[in-house]
A protein has these predicted regions:
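Membrane-interface helix termini and inter-helical loops of multi-pass transporters
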Residues: 2-3, 32-44, 72-76, 160-162
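N-terminal membrane topogenic signal
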Residues: 3-16
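Alpha-helical transmembrane segments of multi-pass membrane proteins
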Residues: 19-34
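Membrane-interface loop-to-helix entry segments
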Residues: 46-61, 104-116
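Helix-adjacent hinge/juxtasegments
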Residues: 60-97
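Membrane-interface helix caps and helix-loop-helix hairpins in membrane proteins
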Residues: 76, 96-107, 128-132
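Hydrophobic alpha-helical segments of small multi-pass membrane proteins
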Residues: 83-96, 110-123, 141-145
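Juxtamembrane boundary at the C-terminal end of a transmembrane helix
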Residues: 150-163
Length: 163
């Protein structure tokens, strides 16, 4: 492999590996067991089967946004910031699942979701000046996290307090 090949494909490799790590970690953390099934849910909640395909689409779009942003970044400092933003976002995403599904604390997950939402917004805003397409590719993620936060908030209201 030449240095040129690696320079071109490095962001793709990062996006694919990071996306797979997050998907596997999220699958482990998401326990749709008796506790979850016992929660009262709002009538507007999407069916459970929708979440897997939606997160798959979101991760594909986010991965594409990362790769495009990486290739259009004006300098190494911007690339470093982009990598950090995506890592932080992935960690927020994973921690939310652990809080909600493993620790059975939707109330804590709701507070943590603010960080998740802000991390998506940060990526969207950070990329818009040098890669507007990357920024737009993050928009569905921001919308989906907004819906998830509304669902999370409603679940807390319907079922809280949690201990």
């Amino acid at each position: 492999m030449s240095a040129e090949w690696f320079a071109h494909y490095k962001p793709i490799i990062f996006a694919v590996v990071w996306g797979l790590v997050l998907a596997l970690a999220g699958a482990w953390a998401t326990d749709i067991g008796e506790w979850y099934k016992s929660l009262q849910q709002p009538p507007w909640k999407p069916p459970d089967w929708v979440f897997g395909p939606m997160w798959t689409v979101i991760f594909i779009l986010a991965g594409a946004a990362f790769v495009m942003g990486y290739h259009r970044a004006p300098n190494q400092e911007t690339i470093r910031m982009l990598v950090i933003l995506f890592i932080v976002n992935g960690l927020f995403n994973f921690i939310w699942s652990v809080l909600y599904f493993r620790m059975h604390r939707p109330d804590w997950a709701l507070i943590e979701a603010i960080g998740l939402w802000l991390s998506v917004l940060a990526i969207l805003l950070a990329t818009r000046s040098y890669s507007p397409v990357s920024s737009w590719l993050m928009a569905p993620y921001l919308v989906w996290v907004s819906i998830a936060m509304a669902l999370n908030w409603t679940t807390v209201k319907l079922n809280g307090p949690f201990t």
